[in-house]
Amino acid sequence: MSPAWAQAFALVFDPYNIWVMLAASLFGLFVGAVPGLTATMATALLVPVTFFMAPIPAIAAIVTATAMAIFSGDIPGCLMRMPGTPASAAYTDEAYAMTKKGQAETALGAGLVFSAVGGLFGTAVLILAAPTLAEFALKFSSFEYFWLVLLGLTCAVFMTSDRPLKGFVSLLLGLLVACVGLGNPAGFPRFTFGNIEMLGGIGMIPLMIGMFAISEIIRFAVDTDPPLKIVDKPLGNVFKGMWGLAKKYPIQILRGSALGTLVGALPGAGADIAAWMSYAISKKFSKEPEKFGTGHVEGIVESGSANNSALAGAWIPALVFGIPGDSITAIVIGVLYMKNMNPGPSLFTNNPQNIYAVYLLFIIANIIMIPLGWWCIKVSKQILKVPRNMLMPVIMLFCVVGSFAINNTAFDVTVMLVAGVVAFVLEENGFPIAPAILGVVLGGMLEENFITSMIKSDGSLGAFFARPVAATLAALTLAVWFLPLLIRRLRALAGV
């Protein structure tokens, strides 16, 4: 065993780290099981706690909490027809139909077991792909990074909404926020309006806490729908028949896991898009498509495999290039910067033990998901009875304290509250917030690499296409923008 792997094992299996993982797992299971509290919110609420942790326990808390929250979102979807997380929404109707047929334990068991399988598959791809990509990325110059960031932002626009114009507006808003302050190549204050607090820019963490947590609190406050009732039927053995399902649907498991990992690696996509795509593909290629929507477990098997594999997939661009694959890894990148672990290829060469520790954390999180998920299913009815009108004030308190604790200033609390209101208004009007988040995270990197490239090339735009990898990334970026327009135009000319 190499010294780096030995250090990674020592870091991960430290007793303190094990306790952190268990506590974060229980927290993630609880948050995911409560309708409306998403895995992203679980991550955002953990950020203030990670201030007081070493890097590996901080990452351990986030990895385990998000993995558990993605799974436990299946529970209210199955028992109440109200998904706990967006990733569970794809197959909520299927799971609820199975519950009404007395097969709730099969639906929940499939979600649990195959989420863990998908998570392990995604982790294997992360372990195999990330070092190779990192070695390749060491050869990148500012030209390649500029196009790579632009490609990531482009994917975020087109993957998170069926209306790209709204995604583009959201992205522009995020890029505008990223421009605030002195942190730019010119060192000139931008959009500060004479406010000293804004010279350092808008804090990423208060902004994300506001956009993900405060927006949900506002949504709950204005929600007038009556609470849904739980299907009160006893749950049997959730593991019964799982081996039979694995033997019956091996292609679906592999396809869902592979698709989830691939979609997760696309910036801005995430587990929810992976689950929806996987469910649609499962129905399209099923031998029994007419059974979908009536309580057919096949779609749950494939989508469940996809949603957790997407989590590991999202870490590939985050660790290798510093480009978040989803909203969760956008928050993670902020945490890594706080811990002086700048994501990118240099992290693989300078601190390989930390990278290996991340691999181990993903493996452990998906393994302990089985027993902890089983326990969560058993106590799920008690969790779902927790009154949300008591829970939301507690969450609000955590948000305020966490935002204030970053710099001990009320300005960050104001940023959090304003961001929450803006995110709520955006989502209520059909604007996705993921492009805005990626704009905030990647705006500085985009500008820095653009300015650096312009200086290198003495102002020549042709240099952006001169290197083979840069030209390839440029072609991909332009194709994502213009191919849909070209296809639409050709269809119009053909009269289709």
Residue ranges and their predicted role:
Residues F30-M41, C78-A89, F121-V125, V263-I273, ...:
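Short helix-coil transition sites and intra-membrane helix breaks within transmembrane domains
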Residues I56-A60, A97-F114, K287-G299, I328-A330, ...:
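Membrane-interface alpha-helices at helix entry/exit sites of multi-pass transporters
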Residues S25-A39, M68-R81, A156-S161, A258-P267, ...:
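Transmembrane alpha-helix interface/packing and boundary motifs in multi-pass membrane proteins
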Residues A39-V49, G77-A97, L128, L171-L172, ...:
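Re-entrant/interfacial helical elements at transmembrane boundaries that shape
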Residues G109-T224, M338-R491:
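Membrane-embedded alpha-helical modules
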Residues T66-G77, G84-T85, H296-F321, G325, ...:
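A structural-propensity feature for long, helix-poor, extended segments
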Residues A67-S72, V113-V125, L133, V177, ...:
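Membrane-embedded alpha-helical segments of transport systems
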Residues M1-I56, P131, L138, F191-H296, ...:
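Helix-loop-helix hairpins and the membrane-proximal interhelical loops
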